[in-house]
Design a protein with these regions (language model features):
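Pyridoxal 5′-phosphate
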Residues: 1-450
């Protein structure tokens, strides 16, 4: 890994380095496949969309189904994980008296989606509040307490939304245990696995969550936007519409009849669930069709999925120790851990390092008073500007990017490993982060660009 996949010719753009954790990137072989598909679509749009695409979608769905260890007829493709989560929640028919449980570190767009659902359905939300770092089993206990407290209020807890890997802070979530607990409590498990497929080993056939979605463009090396949505056969009767509703819509038995679809495709013998997602409005779906090319790259250039998983985890954790050592701080992990391999939170290709910049976030930071810092606690209203300035400066002065964000009374930085990165890349960025922190401490930052 590291430089190996880049020789004799680089297969990723150099400017993509260190920037793929948020939106993903893809190698040149996949880009060539994308451009060829787009050229074919433009030269013969009707045959391509009506005939070529359904068959090619089947090949892509088979690839991701095999990677997730589930049947092809239980996976479809959507634009992104946010769309996947929204599609499931929209189809559950949530109403007043129902509740959805979610966690404090939920992805921001998903939380806004939940707020919107409350406005439209009058359902209730119950947030599991917590502060990292802590032991994963404590999270599970807090979740069970939240479910039972909601029931004590007379609410029907329909579903729980949680991640495979939290976006910020970048830590692995105890999603396997939460699926077990949801099953025991009679709550539908909806996994937002945005940072899942291609990043960590996933066996949904064994895990058996109720719903799962994951971006292929973040870690599987497909173009944007491309995500998998998994719905096991036992729940497919619940899913009757896409977002937006399109030609595959499955009306309720008492609904008015609709005319025959003008988008009948060449792919026969499919379930209503599969057909539902085969054509969703008119968009460029060629990223979906690049999954076979991405999987070929992973096998032939990177040495296969297991090698990728191992490389990402080891590099991310080595990188975190390098950066924390330079800053004189620590990596986010469970209390009392002596080596990163003992940590569940660090068992992935993203890690989170504390910056020596305390903040006034309304919490009591006195227990952390002995930790290294370069300045007095930042007022809460200054934190967004400082984070933006640090991120802007990383781009403008160093042509790289790392998310900087507040959590639990401190600023933190998220590190993402990738197959095109290696140890020296993080040895390079560590003193840069240290310099930025010292500049914040000296109050030398200019007005952040909005």
């Amino acid at each position: 890994m590291g430089e190996d996949p880049r020789t004799p010719h680089r297969v990723f753009l150099r400017s993509a380095y260190s920037r793929s954790g948020s939106f993903g990137t893809h190698p040149f072989p996949v880009r060539h496949a994308l451009h060829n598909l787009q050229s074919e679509a433009e030269s013969r749009p009707d045959p391509f969309i009506r005939r070529t695409t359904p068959q090619a979608l089947d090949s892509s769905r088979q690839e991701v189904a095999s990677l997730l260890h589930v049947p092809k007829n239980e996976v479809v493709l959507v634009k992104n994980a946010t769309t996947g989560v929204h599609t499931i929640l929209h189809n559950l028919g949530l109403k007043k008296g129902d509740a959805v449980v979610y966690f404090d570190t939920v992805y921001g767009a998903v939380e806004r989606m939940l707020f919107s659902s409350v406005e439209m359905t009058s359902m209730a939300l119950k947030k599991v509040k917590y502060r990292l770092p802590l032991h994963p089993e404590e999270l599970v206990t807090k979740f069970v307490d939240a479910v039972r407290a909601a029931r004590d209020e007379g609410l029907n807890v329909r579903a729980a939304v949680f991640e495979t890997i939290v976006s910020m802070p970048g830590v692995r979530f105890p999603f396997e245990r939460l699926v077990e607990v949801c099953r025991a409590e009679g709550v539908l498990s909806l996994i937002d696995g945005a940072h899942g497929i291609g990043h960590i080993p996933l066996d949904l056939g064994t895990l058996q969550p109720d719903f799962f979605t994951s971006n292929c463009h973040k870690w599987l090396y497909t173009p944007r936007g491309c995500a998998v949505l998994y719905v096991p056969l036992r729940h497919q009767h619940l899913i009757r519409t896409t977002l937006p509703t399109s030609w595959g819509y499955i009306p309720a038995p008492d609904s008015p009849s609709t005319g025959a679809s003008t988008m009948q495709t060449a792919g026969g013998g499919k379930s209503a669930f599969e057909s539902l997602f085969e054509f969703v409005a008119t968009t460029d779906d060629t990223p979906y069709l690049c999954i076979p090319a991405a999987m070929k790259f992973r096998r032939e250039t990177c040495g296969g999925d297991e090698r990728i998983f191992t490389y990402l985890e080891e590099l991310a954790n080595e990188a975190a120790d390098i950066v924390a050592g330079e800053l004189g701080t620590e990596v986010m992990q469970e209390p009392g851990i002596k080596h990163w391999k003992e940590s569940l939170l660090r068992k992935c290709g993203m890690t989170t390092v504390r910056l020596p910049i305390p903040i006034q976030d309304g919490t009591d930071i006195s227990p952390d008073a002995g930790k290294k810092r370069v300045c007095m606690p930042l007022p809460a209203d200054e934190v967004p500007g400082v984070c933006r300035w640090m991120q802007d400066t990383l781009v403008d002065e160093y042509d790289t990017f790392l998310p900087v964000f507040p959590h639990g009374g401190w600023l933190w930085a998220r590190l993402s490993a990738q197959v095109y990165l290696e140890k020296k890349d993080f040895e390079w960025v560590a003193p840069i982060l240290k310099d930025l922190c010292e500049r914040v401490g000296k109050k030398s930052q200019p007005e952040a660009k909005l």
